[in-house]
Amino acid sequence: MTSTVSGTETSLRSLRDRPFELLKELEKRSRAVTVGNAPQTSAGREWVGVAFRMGGETFLVAREETREVLGYPAVVTRIPGAKGWVKGLANVRGQLLPMLDLRQFLGSGATASGRNTRVVVVNHREIPAGLMVDEVLGFRRFAEAEFNAEAPPTVIRCDSYLAGAFRRGGEVWPVLSLKSLVESQSFLQAAS
């Protein structure tokens, strides 16, 4: 048993610098342990998203719209003539990725870079983008029956990019559509 625990710790440690892969591995292991113990939802189907904090608010993005989650890169090269919310380009495993401050793009001030700051990489075929957020909270699962197409009001002005919300108990989780965001004219006009 000790060797199994040691092997598990080692493989998880190897994912320490790749937060999204770490979350996926933890999810996989959790599912393996709870297979057969998990209650079926009345709706039968579930929605999985990545939860993150921006300002003082929490949001969700669909797992399918998220390629990965990164720590904020140590080196980001500024792009002359770009708007303030365009932080620059980062070399991520040999690929150039535009780094963008999501909160600043939405007009709610700049995101302070700290140890919890993360970059949510958008899973879009034509528009590569890394969106800087205050913190990623991990995966959240909801029954489809918990979804409401009416988005709640938010302090951060992002209404045109909200695709509804999930409600559970007293909590409301607005769903931000990354596809709508990156395909919007405001987003595509990054030059100042």
Segment roles from a protein language model:
Residues 1-192:
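An acidic, low-aromatic, low-complexity terminal/linker signal
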